[in-house]
Curated annotation (Swiss-Prot):
The keyword Nucleotidyltransferase applies. It comes from Renibacterium salmoninarum (strain ATCC 33209 / DSM 20767 / JCM 11484 / NBRC 15589 / NCIMB 2235). This is Phosphopantetheine adenylyltransferase. InterPro entries: Cyt_trans-like (IPR004821), PPAT (IPR001980), Rossmann-like_a/b/a_fold (IPR014729). ATP binds at residues 9-10, 17, 89-91, 99, 123-129. Homohexamer.
Amino acid sequence: MRRAVCPGSLDPIHNGHLEVIARAAGLFDEVIVAVSTNYAKKYRFSLEERLEMASETLASLRGIVIEPMGAGLLAEYCRQRGASAIVKGIRSSSDFDYEVPMATMNRQLTGVETVFLPAEARYLHLSSTMIKEVEGLGGDVSDYVPRAVLRRFHEGKETN
């Protein structure tokens, strides 16, 4: 079985993530969407909420497993899960410059390869940070995020 890992904090998951994950699902028998937590970052959504939004959004795709990644090295996580590849979406040359050293280290640590998928043009500008900023300032992000995320944004406004 060809298994890959798509890692990300997914805070929140957006249509650019979905596009990369769907393409990865076409390349591999199983894709583990590993939802990560960096304790140095401040998150809008809890890990549980991010897992729920990803699960709801990706339910129609075959071969997708969604789970928390936990602490530790991505290369070691891939080895433990039997994944031969890491799939990363690339929006720009700066993404590539950032990802290549990590891909090289991951390959040297455990032999896991990194597959880079260029983002579709309509998603080149998307980032979770930008989506949170636009939404927080009252902008309409409905073209950029799945319904599960929109619902969470609206629920957050109702409780504030």
